[in-house]
């Protein structure tokens, strides 16, 4: 059995860092050591920033984005075409599409995809909010930009079925997005091309 070489506070820091996506136990130890070595330049400011984020971050009641205001900056941006909504699975997808800079539209974050095997149904996602937004009127196009997975395609078809009879054009990203690919990992050029080549469902 390995002996403990640090105090419980450092062990707790490592354990929490290891829960961050992309960081395993080894990477978490390296990150923790780096933060500790740069205590004044990194650890202190990071601690303060995390405290502020914990106190101030909100989920937008309109679109599901994360921001420090509700409704969020995207929803209140008068320079955006609010008649076009890009539907994404997660906030990271919203950020990826914004980095691509191909469209200046509104967004709607579902919070995942339908997955009966995992027990995730329509009521577990932000689908009702989307249907309500479209039902209010003023939306001319809905771009479904979910990942090209079985769950993503199932979700896209479910949303399309729920919006039958409403006067809204429903499109999806073109097949430039690889099957099984996730938007957050695609480069900006691929995302921009996929948005421009979207097709009607």
UniProtKB/Swiss-Prot annotation:
GO BP: any one term: DNA repair
Record-annotated Toprim domain positions: 83-178
Pfam families: RecR_C (PF21175), RecR_HhH (PF21176), RecR_ZnF (PF02132), Toprim_4 (PF13662)
SUPFAM superfamilies, per the entry: Recombination protein RecR
Cell membrane among keywords: no
Protein keywords: DNA damage, DNA recombination, DNA repair, Metal-binding, Zinc, Zinc-finger
Cross-referenced CDD domains: TOPRIM_recR
Coiled coil, from the record: none
HAMAP family, alphabetized: RecR
Family per record: Belongs to the RecR family.
Protein name: Recombination protein RecR
């Amino acid at each position: 059995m390995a002996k403990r070489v640090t105090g419980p506070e450092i062990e707790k820091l490592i354990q929490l860092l290891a829960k961050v996506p992309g960081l395993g136990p080894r990477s978490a130890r390296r990150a923790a050591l780096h933060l500790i070595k740069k205590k004044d330049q990194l650890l202190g400011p990071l601690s303060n920033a995390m405290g502020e984020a914990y106190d101030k971050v909100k989920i937008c009641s309109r679109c599901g984005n994360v921001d420090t205001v509700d409704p969020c900056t995207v929803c209140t941006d008068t320079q955006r075409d609010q008649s076009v909504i890009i539907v994404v699975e997660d906030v990271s997808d919203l950020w990826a599409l914004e980095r691509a800079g191909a469209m200046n539209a509104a967004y709607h974050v579902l919070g995942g995809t339908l997955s009966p095997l995992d027990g995730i149904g329509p009521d577990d996602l932000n689908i009702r909010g989307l249907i309500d937004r479209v039902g209010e009127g003023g939306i001319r196009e809905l771009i479904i930009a979910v990942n090209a997975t079985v769950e993503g395609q199932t979700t896209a078809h479910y949303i399309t079925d729920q919006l039958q009879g409403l006067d809204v054009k429903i499109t999806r990203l073109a097949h430039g997005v690889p099957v099984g690919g996730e938007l957050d990992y695609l480069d900006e050029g691929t995302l921009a091309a996929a948005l421009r080549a979207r097709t009607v469902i």
